[in-house]
Amino acid sequence: MRTAQVSRSTAETEISVSVNLDGSGTYDNQTGVGFFDHMLDQLSRHSLIDMTIRAKGDYHIDDHHTVEDTGIALGQALVQALGDKKGINRYGECHLPMDDAQVRAALDLSARPFLVWNVDLPTQKIGSFDTELVREFFQALATHGGITLHIDQIHGVNSHHIAEAAFKAVARALRTAVEVDPRKADAVPSTKGAL
């Protein structure tokens, strides 16, 4: 089983994450940040990665540390669950529409973290959620998951739709990238022999 559990405890947050890369997209995410939970649920459902996430943060300040630290812990869990990465597709991409929004995500599970973020969320808030935290989450996920991650907004006028399209596009790209190709199940997907 390609599974992992990660706990992260700081003066600002307490996070626990468990993932199953060979799951069916079941989820139980409770971070105390409603819109963020909704996005994490989409990430799980559309990647088919089972996720259970618990987070407690310094909400009296804002949601920044909770969102960022969840991205850190989830990235670390993905690295653990992937192990030596033998047999994985490694690459994934998705061009995803959601009403007015269209977002493209392309990623490489290369152990070379990098985020390209070409997304313009037109409002500062989605409900009470700070829209700048969408990028913060993906930056933390890419950095600590060793992911080269490109997210590009093609269209969109509604912040909720754009953000949700981004999470779903990344989810679909992850789904492809973590899948094992039986034709190369014992090989690392690199001519270097390691990732």
From Swiss-Prot:
Name of the top EC class for this enzyme: lyase
One of the GO biological process terms: L-histidine biosynthetic process
Pathway terms, separated by semicolons: Amino-acid biosynthesis; L-histidine biosynthesis; L-histidine from 5-phospho-alpha-D-ribose 1-diphosphate: step 6/9
Locations listed in the record: Cytoplasm
Keyword Electron transport belongs to the record: no
Pfam families reported in the protein's UniProt record: IGPD (PF00475)
Single GO molecular function: imidazoleglycerol-phosphate dehydratase activity
Keywords: Amino-acid biosynthesis, Cytoplasm, Histidine biosynthesis, Lyase
EC numbers for this chain: 4.2.1.19
Catalytic activity: D-erythro-1-(imidazol-4-yl)glycerol 3-phosphate = 3-(imidazol-4-yl)-2-oxopropyl phosphate + H2O
GO cellular component, one term: cytoplasm
NCBIfam families recorded: PRK00951.1-5, PRK00951.2-1, PRK00951.2-4
Similarity comment: family membership: Belongs to the imidazoleglycerol-phosphate dehydratase family.
Full protein name: Imidazoleglycerol-phosphate dehydratase
Lineage: Bacteria, Pseudomonadati, Pseudomonadota, Alphaproteobacteria, Rhodobacterales
